[in-house]
Amino acid sequence: MASSMISSGTVATVSADRPAPAQARMVAPFNGLKSSSAFPVTRKSNDITSIASNGGRVQCMQVWPPLGLKKFETLSYLPPLSSESLAKEVDYLLRKNWVPCLEFELETGFVYRENHRSPGYYDGRYWTMWKLPMFGCTDSSQVLKELEEAKKAYPQSFIRIIGFDNVRQVQCISFIAYKPAGF
């Protein structure tokens, strides 16, 4: 702000004696792209029924029912996955070079907060690992075989399949593969 206090005559003599400082050579600020008249514009309706692709038979979209159904994890809104669907999911994580692993929970497979009180994705549950992660697994049938063994050993447990990226050292996918009767 000192530059605004000096007189204009002083500025003229300073600029005549030496080159102008970098501040005097500032470029005008960026004002954005060219006017929008050069670009074609389409106006879209905000009507949600225009998004539906079922011939307009839908007036509104149904959400998860709040009563009687517990929220589990990824894919929990779908009906129980068949062996073929599970094999496709496992094939996907194998194609991504993730390491499959099975975990089980004997009491509650749904989301709740016990050991962790802050909001967010992680809810503080601890699942028990079924054997070791399946490093070197190349076929989804190997994972499904382990899933069947886990079901026989713990028929009243929730069993999930996770995909672990051992390069980034993060869990990339997790979904419930088996729920006990009554869930």
From Swiss-Prot:
> What SUPFAM superfamilies does its record include?
RuBisCO, small subunit
The signal peptide stretch is: none
Q: Which Pfam families does this one have?
A: RbcS, RuBisCO_small
User: Where is this protein localized, as stated in its record?
Assistant: Plastid, Chloroplast
Q: Which UniProt keywords apply?
A: Calvin cycle, Carbon dioxide fixation, Chloroplast, Photorespiration, Photosynthesis, Plastid, Transit peptide
* GO cellular component labels: chloroplast
InterPro entries documented for this protein: RuBisCO_ssu, RuBisCO_ssu_dom, RuBisCO_ssu_N, RuBisCO_ssu_sf
Q: Cite the residue span of the transit peptide.
A: 1-59
Question: What broad class describes the main subcellular location of this protein?
Answer: plastid
GO biological process terms on file: photorespiration; reductive pentose-phosphate cycle
**A Gene Ontology MF term for this entry?**
ribulose-bisphosphate carboxylase activity
Other comment: The basic functional RuBisCO is composed of a large chain homodimer in a 'head-to-tail' conformation. In form I RuBisCO this homodimer is arranged in a barrel-like tetramer with the small subunits forming a tetrameric 'cap' on each end of the 'barrel'.
Subunit record text: Heterohexadecamer of 8 large and 8 small subunits.
Q: Which family does it belong to?
A: Belongs to the RuBisCO small chain family.
Q: What's this protein's function?
A: RuBisCO catalyzes two reactions: the carboxylation of D-ribulose 1,5-bisphosphate, the primary event in carbon dioxide fixation, as well as the oxidative fragmentation of the pentose substrate. Both reactions occur simultaneously and in competition at the same active site. Although the small subunit is not catalytic it is essential for maximal activity.
This protein's name? Ribulose bisphosphate carboxylase small subunit, chloroplastic
Q: Which organism is it from?
A: Pyrus pyrifolia (Chinese pear)
Q: What are the leading ranks of the lineage?
A: Eukaryota, Viridiplantae, Streptophyta, Embryophyta, Tracheophyta
Q: Which gene encodes it?
A: RBCS
